């Protein structure tokens, strides 16, 4: 049995996300001239600093000075008025119906949401399918909760109109007893977007084998070149108790 220290060691990372397999400059040939200006760190999703939205400071001061109680501890799932507002906006955005009382939890960031979702669905010895490549923390969290990994390859370099998931291998993993499937859409780090056909086939397989699925849709707003996006929950194929959607 692993100690608490051993488990938390599995979450450690010496480098920032996206830098765990950095190339040595001796291994690549740099082409072109140096570009002017400040360097941009592309190892994270936030590549720029954004000022607060208009009215943010005024509303914060109003809540702090006039209401007061908004700065006290709140219920763990989030304040009711915020849940109602977020549920409405997410329902409109994702083309699905979200019950704010029973189907929505507000967390301090999507990493916290991912930790809660994995911890709620995986226990020691559970078989878990993940995509390779995908968000680096997926693998770490499965190890932390002592699950057994089943990697499924994403052939994203050879497709332009889809992500390139190996659906046959995914189904075989379900046949072998995988109980939870974790993936991000758009894929992090490649940025490819799953086609509607791929998302539909994933949903059909999840329902057929009664698998839990955790889908990270954090970057679903960052679509380019006329790409279309299909929210997994919007297909209404998977029972709601079998799907967790993470979005920010």
Model-derived regions: residue spans:
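Conserved core of the PLP fold type I
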Residues: 69-205, 220-245
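Walker B catalytic acidic pair
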Residues: 217
